[in-house]
């Protein structure tokens, strides 16, 4: 069951784009059934956010009697570590194992050199927020995505999702050529 709860939190995070510090504070009181939205104040930025409840999230909320899954640890500070370990296992079981480059933190928080590992070993709680931003980029208005994720500047947002103006210019040029 704990892996199932971790999976549910991971799916929710991919569709609501919040930092884990805000994600794990969500409760039934954040669900507005009348408007089918989740309302919250982000912990880091103090920004108020209203996020539509998409079908994938609704199915999980329904599975948990109209609320969010239980936390993975009774100690809030331990929840992040348990969640990170659990989503690695969830991704391993889901065979998300292609080799990819990534950075891992050394003890003390300093970044280490780039390593090549199976993707599931590099997954952290941050993957949901970044996936939300990357997956909806180009499909939703950029300002809408930034409003949900809490990014205040376009440059920080584009850096966050590994996009830049050159890539956008190439895509625009390609679209123009295909339209002619």
Residue spans for each PLM region:
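Basic, Lys/Arg- and aromatic-enriched nucleic-acid-binding interface segment
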Residues: 1-20, 24, 81
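Short, basic (Lys/Arg/His-rich) helix/loop patches that form interaction surfaces
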Residues: 2-3, 88-147
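Hydrophobic (often cysteine-bearing) scaffold residues that line and stabilize catalytic clefts
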Residues: 5-6, 79, 83, 125, ...
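Catalytic core segments in nucleotide and nucleic-acid processing enzymes
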Residues: 16, 27-40, 53
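Short, polar N-cap/turn motifs at the start of nucleic acid-interacting alpha helices
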Residues: 29-37, 121-122, 134, 138-160
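Catalytic-site neighborhood detector that most strongly recognizes the C-terminal catalytic loop/helix
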Residues: 42-46, 142, 149-174
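C-terminal catalytic core of Y-nucleophile DNA break-rejoin enzymes
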Residues: 43-110, 122
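C-terminal secondary-structure termini that scaffold catalytic or DNA-interacting sites
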Residues: 96-98, 174-180
């Amino acid at each position: 069951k704990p892996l199932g709860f971790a999976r549910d939190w991971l799916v929710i995070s991919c569709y609501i784009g919040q930092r884990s510090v805000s994600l794990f504070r969500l409760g039934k009181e954040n669900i507005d059934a009348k408007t089918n939205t989740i309302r919250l104040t982000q912990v880091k930025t103090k920004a108020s956010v209203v996020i539509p409840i998409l079908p994938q999230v609704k199915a999980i909320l329904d599975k948990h009697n109209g609320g969010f899954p239980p936390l993975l640890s009774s100690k809030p500070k331990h929840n992040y570590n348990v969640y990170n370990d659990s989503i690695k296992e969830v991704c391993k079981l889901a065979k998300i194992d292609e080799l990819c480059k990534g950075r891992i933190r050394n003890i003390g928080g300093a970044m280490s050199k780039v390593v090549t590992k199976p993707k599931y070993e590099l997954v952290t709680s941050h993957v949901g927020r970044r996936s939300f931003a990357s997956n909806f980029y180009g499909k939703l208005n950029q300002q809408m995505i930034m409003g949900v994720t809490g990014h205040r500047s376009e440059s920080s947002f584009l850096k966050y999702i590994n996009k830049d103006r050159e890539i956008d210019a190439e895509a625009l040029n390609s679209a123009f050529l295909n339209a002619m």
